[in-house]
Amino acid sequence: MSIQIKQSTMVRPAEETPNKSLWLSNIDMILRTPYSHTGAVLIYKQPDNNEDNIHPSSSMYFDANILIEALSKALVPFYPMAGRLKINGDRYEIDCNAEGALFVEAESSHVLEDFGDFRPNDELHRVMVPTCDYSKGISSFPLLMVQLTRFRCGGVSIGFAQHHHVCDGMAHFEFNNSWARIAKGLLPALEPVHDRYLHLRPRNPPQIKYSHSQFEPFVPSLPNELLDGKTNKSQTLFILSREQINTLKQKLDLSNNTTRLSTYEVVAAHVWRSVSKARGLSDHEEIKLIMPVDGRSRINNPSLPKGYCGNVVFLAVCTATVGDLSCNPLTDTAGKVQEALKGLDDDYLRSAIDHTESKPGLPVPYMGSPEKTLYPNVLVNSWGRIPYQAMDFGWGSPTFFGISNIFYDGQCFLIPSRDGDGSMTLAINLFSSHLSRFKKYFYDF
């Protein structure tokens, strides 16, 4: 699909901001490699009624000048996003130098319908998300890049490339929400807090009370037929309607379970089982379920301040044999998921922070495979708490929000419906030879 870059602007904060180095926590640094950005897209379809898309300050649909001016103002309180990475000894820091965030304006000759259901893939990422040149070193590239793309149908997309060392998805949403509010002439909803050293530094001396297997590298054990480099991976979307989710829950035997199982726990367990079956693994093989968890509500001694703008993502891990996943009831599997999630309390998370300090140079735990696979494991990331409907810049709420590209086999995202109808979308990357079998097992209940 064709894409033409019309203009690129380095947007700097509208006012003077603190010129300092920002200490990064171990949790900031361990979630991704420093030479990477996370891509996501918002889709806005132009309403049929022109009166529905009139911004109070502009008659143009998604006026780039308004977005750039608002972005410049949003970067004042969120000033680390306008900085650059640097190395201080053996640690990365953010140099808050106000060099700016990149804003790209682009046009495509295609219509939004050409992308179908907006399933993540290389082409969608290429067209809608700005690219980054990492070749000039760690301090050369922006930590935030945004692309406004106009399509022939009149619709637009806003693609984000956000650096995970700066913040996690929830904090990035707060930035986007503030940017959108400013574009409408409103004040930001909250004041961001950037001090990670005060709130998430390790204890001295460390108090490591648990084994923290989630930080062990997940080394892939690919079978020979997947090692030839010729086996493709495929990314696709699977939708579970509210009725299907209810049917799945009705399969549960809750007679001996005194705690209610959440929708995420049930669906994550179902995905775990379905992937293990689709891969055709032997019954004795172990398969891990990896679940990124927002720790904001779990850290309480002391609690994090509202508006904390860093990474608070921790990993919960379940382990089971393929035979157990296949033979045991879904209730048992979902119970294991619930137990793993409940274990991430304040005591455990503080211990995890101390553990990372005791292991200098700890590798990114689940993103270190040159084959870009988690095989035989699976990662289920929930975006259910990101209220993307609030990202209204003055021309209406987005009709779609999702990940732009999933690079690793076994990695998936659960995203709730924007319509609030109780349905969920699963975006997943699997080896192509496993995908059709996964679909069969995923809908077989």
Swiss-Prot record:
Inactive below pH 7.0. This is Anthranilate N-benzoyltransferase protein 1. Its EC number is 2.3.1.144. Pathway: Phytoalexin biosynthesis; methoxydianthramide B biosynthesis. It comes from the Eukaryota. Disulfide bonds: none annotated. It is an enzyme of class 2 (transferase). Belongs to the plant acyltransferase family. The gene is HCBT1. Keywords: Acyltransferase, Flavonoid biosynthesis, Transferase. One of its GO terms (molecular function) is anthranilate N-benzoyltransferase activity. Induction: By fungal elicitors. Elicitation triggers a rapid, transient induction, reaching maximal abundances within about 0.5 hours and returning to basal levels within 4 hours. The active site is at residues 164, 392. The keyword Acyltransferase applies. Catalyzes the formation of N-benzoylanthranilate, in the course of methoxydianthramide B, a phytoalexin. Phytoalexins are produced in response to infection by parasites, and are essential for the expression of disease resistance. It comes from Dianthus caryophyllus. It holds the Pfam family Transferase. One of its GO terms (biological process) is flavonoid biosynthetic process. It catalyses: anthranilate + benzoyl-CoA = N-benzoylanthranilate + CoA. N-terminus is blocked.
